[in-house]
A protein has these predicted regions:
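Predominant activation on well-ordered alpha-helical scaffold segments within soluble catalytic domains
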Residues: 7, 11, 24-27, 31, ...
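Acidic/His-rich, divalent-metal-binding segments that scaffold phosphate/diphosphate chemistry
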Residues: 1-61
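C-terminal binding/interaction regions
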Residues: 14, 124, 129-131, 136-183
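Divalent metal-dependent catalytic cores for phosphoryl transfer on phosphate-bearing substrates
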Residues: 37-139, 151
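Short polybasic/polar patches that bind polyanions
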Residues: 11, 31, 35, 74, ...
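Amphipathic, non-membrane alpha-helical segments in soluble helical-bundle scaffolds
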Residues: 16, 99-102, 162
Length: 183
């Protein structure tokens, strides 16, 4: 499945434009992580693009979340590597390879970085790791972001938090125009 088909599938399932923007931003971060790890950015990008495809339908039902989306992806002919990583996003037992472990900190750091971008006049342009690190310590900033998933990146994928921030910023900048995060 190429990206245009994948975006069309996402748009057919997502009920909110905010969901689509979230999926595209996580896609950008996953593509950047793939390049860093010498993996296929198209595969990793699709994992990011699809990871919350059922978010608007499952409405926080953690048992169904990702399982509904996995069913849609299988029906659309998406490969099991991608489907497994989508399941891994919400169900730990599926975290069996690097891409399925990477989606967890990638999702969390993307949400955090988007929050950082939204409070800056320049939005995603020119974000600095040091500023993000400082904001991470502020519990009142982006309180919905699971900071443990960000801090756990060293154990899960072998990256320090600063490195995850740096790669995440690059990934976010790569899709900033598409998701409205430019000044």
């Amino acid at each position: 499945m190429d990206r245009a088909e994948a975006v069309a599938l996402v748009r057919s399932k997502a009920e909110k434009e905010t969901t689509v923007r979230h999926l595209i931003t996580v896609e950008g971060v996953m593509r950047r992580l793939a390049v860093h790890f010498g993996e296929d950015p198209d595969t990793w990008g699709l994992v990011g693009l699809f990871h919350d495809i059922d978010q608007d339908q499952t409405h926080g039902d953690l048992e169904r979340h990702a399982r509904v989306g996995a069913g849609w992806l299988r029906e659309a002919g998406v490969g099991e590597t991608i489907v497994n990583a989508v399941l891994a996003h919400a169900h730990e037992q599926y975290r069996t390879d690097l891409v399925s472990r990477a989606i967890v900190p990638a999702d969390a750091v993307t949400g955090f970085l988007v929050a950082c971008a939204l409070v800056r006049p320049e939005k995603a342009s020119g974000m600095k790791v040091s500023s993000c690190r400082k904001k991470l310590k502020e519990r009142s900033f982006a309180p919905g972001v699971n900071r443990d998933e960000i801090r756990g990146c060293e154990a899960s994928i072998g990256l320090g938090v600063d490195e995850l921030f740096a790669l995440g910023i690059e990934g976010l900048e790569s899709v900033a125009d598409e998701v409205g995060l430019t000044a």
